[in-house]
Each structure stands twice: as structure tokens, then as C-alpha cells.
UniProtKB/Swiss-Prot annotation:
GO BP: viral RNA genome replication
Pfam families attached to this UniProt entry: RdRP_3, Tombus_P33
Protein's name according to its UniProt entry: RNA-directed RNA polymerase
Protein species of origin: Tobacco necrosis virus (strain A)
Alphabetized PROSITE patterns for the sequence: RDRP_SSRNA_POS
InterPro entries assigned to the protein according to its UniProt record, in alphabetical order: DNA/RNA_pol_sf, Rev_trsase/Diguanyl_cyclase, RNA-dir_pol_PSvirus, RNA_pol_HCV, Tombusvirus_p33
Top-tier EC class: transferase
Role summary: RNA-dependent RNA polymerase that plays an essential role in the virus replication.
EC identifiers of the protein: 2.7.7.48
Family note: Belongs to the tombusviridae RNA polymerase family.
Superkingdom of origin organism: Viruses
Something else known: Readthrough of the terminator UAG occurs at position 203.
Keyword annotations from UniProtKB, A to Z: Nucleotide-binding, Nucleotidyltransferase, RNA suppression of termination, RNA-directed RNA polymerase, Transferase, Viral RNA replication
Recorded GO MF terms: nucleotide binding; RNA binding; RNA-directed RNA polymerase activity
Organism placement in taxonomy: Viruses, Riboviria, Orthornavirae, Kitrinoviricota, Tolucaviricetes
Amino acid sequence: MELPNQHKQTAAEGFVSFLNWLCNPWRRQRTVNAAVAFQKDLLAIEDSEHLDDINECFEESAGAQSQRTKVVADGAYAPAKSNRTRRVRKQKKHKFVKYLVNEARAEFGLPKPTEANRLMVQHFLLRVCKDWGVVTAHVHGNVALALPLVFIPTEDDLLSRALMNTHATRAAVRGMDNVQGEGWWNNRLGIGGQVGLAFRSKXGCLERRPGFSTSVSRGEHPDLVVIPSGRPEKQRQLLRYSGIGGHLLIGIHNNSLSNLRRGLMERVFYVEGPNGLQDAPKPVKGAFRTLDKFRDLYTKNSWRHTPVTSEQFLMNYTGRKLTIYREAVDSLSHQPLSSRDAKLKTFVKAEKLNLSKKPDPAPRVIQPRSPRYNVCLGRYLRHYEHHAFKTIAKCFGEITVFKGFTLEQQGEIMRSKWNKYVNPVAVGLDASRFDQHVSVEALEYEHEFYLRDYPNDKQLKWLLKQQLCNVGTAFASDGIIKYKKKGCRMSGDMNTSLGNCILMCAMVYGLKEHLNINLSLANNGDDCVIVCEKADLKKLTSSIEPYFKQFGFKMEVEKPVDIFERIEFCQTQPVFDGSQYIMVRKPSVVTSKDVTSLIPCQTKAQYAEWLQAVGECGMSINGGIPVMQNFYQKLQTGIRRTKFTKTGEFQTNGLGYHSRYMHRVARVPSPETRLSFYLAFGITPDLQEALEIFYDTHKLELDDVIPTDTYQVSGEHLINGLPN
């Protein structure tokens, strides 16, 4: 009886499956034998240190590589130019694989065989192949062979482990018990048992650190007069928990006469030159007229505005600021604004200083005008700011100013800029003391944007004119300083942030037009990152310094990065959380600053409440981020929050501001997140887990306040030395 065709096909497939089953053990054994032979050949190869020896592994590709493409718009593709022209010679494959393994082991040692570590090592090996220009067709095969070998212990690894388990090692470790603590002293006296008592260090404690005044006094200026009062200077204080934070030394400037003088001299009147202090550079005559195209485009995308009422302006504030501005509004109702209200009342900014980076930095000064002046100008520009940022976005064709966005939104915006380019690279612009370089010409150019949107408004014109020539008094507990300064951005003005954004965006737009290249700008005032094609990088970086110099600004180019996570913007870097990118603050900095309080905590209970607030805010922006979520979990003391941390200064500082619209919660970081965190901050997945264990097992002790000159060694050395 003949079988139907369907049954014949089923029988044939079954027979093939049976043959495959019979052959599988043979195939597996053949693969194992090949792996053993490959590993044996690899061990027989001598390690190479000379690049020439590695170069002999390659040959230049005779033909063109397959064309790679990348989506640059909906339905549009662009060719991706590649410099990968080297093929790995077949007879030298073992040597190149061993080179890859040695490079990875030199970078990571013997990592644990986890998925996060596998992704990290794989990324590193792919980067090495890219740096050597290996053609894409040869990358996968070599990386696939090198990757597992990185996790296999060598004879030296086994010997190292064995050394820790010898009789001599154990005897030496036991001997340490008798040279510590009371046991050592008893043994020296010949009394008591021959057993040492190890010292137990405290897990951490509270530390009060007083503010300081600079010992530097440089320069003279005829428009600056110092008038000492003879009274002693008042001390500012920081309260810090030592034992869980980072290794950085954090300090604060006192509002003293010496600090005021140095701050005004070095941050208002003069800039650093090759031979010491000198006047800030002046813009080339007519330079800002070259930026008229951006101003006209801005005006075209904007519209006429009218000032808001005083009550509408007050709705932007709460707490102490609301009280101050309400009193100013009341006084304006029976006493009109005058030129006296435009005078500056200057003081030293109270901020956390990284003294590990700069032991004695020039103090920063805040130069506000009277609240009455701020109310009048704020009625024009406080609500106008958000409109201005949207208009700038229209000019660039994308979101450009990051102010007002959450850290999650900023991460996604930055990623969208990165994805626009086939071979992207990011360049940070370091504006050296931007406010100080804002000339009269720069201010007048900025003011044109406002005056065009408030046409024929005489009061706004008068208010802005007061910023061109500044008269002020700096107040300290031990004296005052009277001074005059033409031009320069006054840091307390209502339009400081908005004005800096407009100026920087205008200049970068002009640079883009001047070079005729495509670029994307991420801006937050004087903090900027430019993303462009790698092919345009040299043209861009060589033009930045001379281009900005013609406008009177000193601009330095930071090291370009071609790894997305390495972008540094406003002291944050992007990290992938498993579903999206989020901007994350630097662990090496925030673990020191976020356990240091500027708010005067009078009792340990208040400081414990402050730590609880920091922990809650930190968790809301770092949930799911390795290391950081464990750090902020530990800061949560369980103390119920009161008005002390729910209102006032805490809600307006950086951490409180960033956490307002974010509600992240703790979750286990994915391997992809650990890889991204490593790429951003250089902390390997193994070290991430070690830090997390340290934070999870640490006990907060808020019992004592120790002298400020006491340095307590703790687990903070785990973070010391990590890349910034």
C-alpha cells in the first residue's frame, strides 16, 4: 500500500531528525576537541608587547567593505563611512585573539562570570577592534573567541588564590591578632592571655566644618574701594556625615571682606592672563552684527508680549521669596521705582566647594539688585523665559535649551540628538567665567531680543539700560566694598539664565552657519555640548576658540567623546536604565556633597530629617541606577519630615528642584544598566555590587559631633580614585 505524499514527507523529516540525533554527540565532541586545540595553541603563543608584532596580524582589505547604512530620517538612509580596512590574517588569528584577551585582563583583571561583566568585556573588545580598524566581517569571530577566555582563570590566578590558603599565610593572619588593641599592650607587658583585641572603627559620625577666608589678595582697581569695619568676620558652617560619603573635601567660603575682595577682583574686574590678572577681552567691533540672522529668525518665530500683573508675578514664588517680593510690590504702590533700586547689594555665595579639586578657589559673588527692581523686570521676563526657550527650539529645529526638563526627559532629548548622526561625536564647550566676559555689546545684543517682543516699552528699556553700568556695595560682617563696573553679567539679575542661553545659542548658531556643517546643541546657559558628525570634528574644534574670541569670550574645547555615556552635561552623564536614558549626577561628587548640609541644622534630629529628605529626593531621581539607589536608600533615616525640609531653601536647591516631577523607585538594575553605568563613570559591575553591599550593610551613627580636624577612615576609599 503506497503512503500519501504528506506521510512520506513526515517520515523523511523524522529520519533526518534521527540522523541528527545520532550525529550530535560526535559534533559536540568535535567542537570540544577544536576548543581544546585552540586553547592549547593560544597558550603556546608568546605575549607581544610591540605594536609591530600586532600589526603583522593584519592585512589591508583589497576590496571595499559592504556598505553600512543608518536611518537618518523617516524612510531615508545614509551611507556610513568606515575607516575599517584591516583584515585579520588567518594564520595570525590565534595571536590577535590572545592580544585581545591580554588587553581585557589588563583592564578588568579576572571578572566574575556575570551577564553584566560579559557585556562590559564584550563592549571593550569591540572597541579595541574598532581602534585597530578591523573590518566588521572579522570582528565578531575574533571577539567571540576572546570573550570567554577573559573569564577563564590562568595559572597565575590559581596560584594567587592558593597563596591565600597556605599554612604560612594563615599563620601570618593569626599573628596580626596579637599586634592590635589591648591584646598587643598586654602581650608587651607579659600579662593576660595571648589573644589580641582588634580595633573597631566607628561606622561614621557627624562633623562640623567651619567656613574659611582666602589668604590671597591680588590686584588693584580705581573703581573698587575697600572699607574695613574692624569687626570680626562671621563663620559659616557645614554639617557633614563622614563614613558613608565620598572622599572629597568639601568646604564653604565665609562672607568676609577678604573673600569679597578676591571674588570681585578675579570674577568681576579681571581675568587670568599669561602674566597674571588682566582686563577681560573686548569683542571685535561689529562682531555681534554677524549674529543678526539668528536674532531676526528668533523674532520671526516669536510674537508681541505684554507684561504680567504684579499678582501674576508673585504666583511664581513661595516661602521667604514670596514674602520679600510681596513687600516690594506693596512699596512700589506708594513709591515709584528709581535708579537707587538698580544698585547692587553683593555678598559671597554660600556653596559647597570641592577643595580636593581646588584648595583655595576664588569665591563666587552674588550681585542682586533691590527686590523692587526685580519685581518690575520680572513682570516682563519671568514668564517670558519659557517662551524664549521654545522659540530658540524653533530656530534650531529641535529642543536646544534643557532648562525645565526632568533628568529623564533630558536623557531622551540628548539621545535623540545623538541618533541624528551616522558617526556621532560630542564636544563639550568650557566657557571660562562666562558672566565675566559678557561685555556691554553682548548685553545690548541680548536686550534687542526682549525689546523687539515688547516694542516701544519705555519702562523695559530703562530697566535693561541699568544693567549696562553697574554701581554696587558688597557687604561683609567685617567691612564693605564700594565699586562700579561697566558691563559684565550681574549674577543676581532676573535675566541671568535667560540672557546666557540667548547669547550662547546665538553664537553657536552663528558658528554653525559660518562652518556650514550640521550640529546639535545642548544648552543650559554657559554649559554647552555640541553633537556632530565625526567627519566634521576637526573643522569644528579648530574654529571654536578663535570664533568665540571675536565676541569677547574665552572658550575651551573639552576632549571629544564617541561613546554616548561619556557625554558630560551640567555635571551629569546619560545612563540607560533598561528602558530609557536618564541623566545621572557623578557618583564621585554627589556622594560627598549630598551628605553635606548648607542648611543650618541646630540639632542631630534636624540633620537626621535633612538626610531623610536627601534620601527621598535622591531616590526619586536615581531609582534603578546602580550604586546610587543604594546610597540614597541608606540616607533615609526613617525620620518623619516637617516644615523644616518641606518648605524653604531645601525645596529650591539642586536636588529638591530636580526631584519635583520624578517618582522613580528602587529596582534591581539590569545587566544593560550596569554596562551603561560602567561606560559613564568607569565603575565596573563587580565594583558596583561591592559598593552596593557596603551601603546596604553600613549603619548610620549620628551620636557625636567630632572635631573638624579629625579624619576618619571608612568605606569611602572604595570610591576614591574612580574616574570622574
